[in-house]
A protein has these predicted regions:
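Membrane-interface extramembranous regions
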Residues: 1-157
């Protein structure tokens, strides 16, 4: 579901670019905005109680935190705030590079929680699916962080 949100949002932004909205003239910027939409959606789960959303809620996410990490509930709130800050950073051109790099690091740091949850038998995305998704999110964040160079002449820049 999360991957679908990322892909659809990216395609919608790129379509807007094709229709003349200059902000979304490249795939890179459209993907940055698509990732921001995805992050707003996933971050919302960090703050809602059970039964409010079809996605995992705060308690579900706290259960995913490995035992060696202190204050699991607080860590869930913190990562939610970081995801929201990253989303804002991605849509602002002046902060996109820093946001992309920081989000890539965040995605790397969060991967052990997904591995722990899968190995602990929690109801989470299977690792064979989650690890490639996480690699994709890291790649898009780093792609968004890339600065445009003079040699960039195609619409993928």
């Amino acid at each position: 579901m999360i991957l679908i949100v990322l892909l659809v949002a990216t395609l919608v932004f790129r379509l807007l670019g094709a229709l003349g909205v200059a902000r979304f003239a490249t795939w890179r910027v459209s993907a940055a905005h698509g990732l921001a939409v995805m992050l707003v959606m996933t971050a919302s789960a960090h703050f809602v109680p059970a039964g409010v959303t079809f996605m995992p809620n705060h308690a579900d996410l706290a259960a995913m935190v490995p035992p060696f990490v202190p204050f699991p509930a607080l860590m869930v709130y913190l990562t939610g705030v970081l995801e929201l800050a990253g989303a804002v950073g991605l849509v602002l051109e002046g902060t996109r590079r820093a946001a992309g790099i920081c989000l890539a690091l965040l995605f790397v740091v969060l991967l052990p929680a997904n591995v722990y949850a899968a190995l602990a038998g929690l109801d989470v995305t299977p690792l064979w699916q989650r690890v490639p998704e996480q690699v994709l999110y890291i790649g898009i964040a780093l792609w968004a962080a890339r600065t445009r160079t003079r040699s960039t002449v195609n619409s993928f820049g």
